[in-house]
């Protein structure tokens, strides 16, 4: 028999979660290499229904955002095929690329969410890019406005 919907829940509003990301980096101006020393995130996703899962979601999104910001890039050859056809060419961050990662939840009760919760999925990948770009700017005096911010881009922008 076909599935039958017996009950649904929708909210008249979709309250946004909030997150701030702060990063401490070590930057070699000669090579352009950026090392993440410490990343601090403060997240307001209402009342997390499953705090352990919310933490894992946040940590994973931060690492993915760091990869997107510093190393993940897709280029194509003359025939339109991706040049990065394996993880040997397409770099993603590993635990060795990370320093300390600290996530703190700022609880707020959201009356329109289930049990006071808000969403958390997409917000976590959004803060590493601006945080890292600002840290690089503070270290070099140069704003980078395209991602990924590669070591070559940093070294070329700081060459005297």
Task: Give short role names for the model-derived ranges.
Residues 1-160:
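C-terminal catalytic domains of large/alpha subunits in multi-subunit enzymes
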């Amino acid at each position: 028999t076909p599935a039958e919907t017996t009950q649904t829940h929708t909210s008249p509003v979709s309250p946004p979660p909030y997150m701030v990301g702060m990063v401490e980096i070590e930057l070699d101006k000669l090579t352009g290499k950026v090392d993440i020393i410490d990343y601090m995130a403060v997240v307001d996703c209402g009342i997390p229904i499953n705090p352990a899962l919310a933490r894992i979601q946040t940590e994973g999104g931060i690492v993915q955002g760091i990869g997107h910001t510093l190393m993940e890039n897709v280029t194509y050859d003359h025939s339109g095929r991706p040049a990065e056809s394996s993880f040997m060419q397409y770099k993603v961050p590993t635990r060795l690329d990370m320093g300390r990662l600290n996530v703190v939840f700022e609880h707020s009760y959201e009356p329109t969410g289930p049990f006071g919760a808000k969403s958390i999925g997409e917000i976590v990948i959004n803060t590493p890019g601006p945080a890292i770009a600002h840290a690089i700017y503070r270290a070099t005096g140069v704003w980078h406005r395209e991602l990924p911010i590669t070591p070559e881009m940093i070294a070329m922008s700081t060459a005297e």
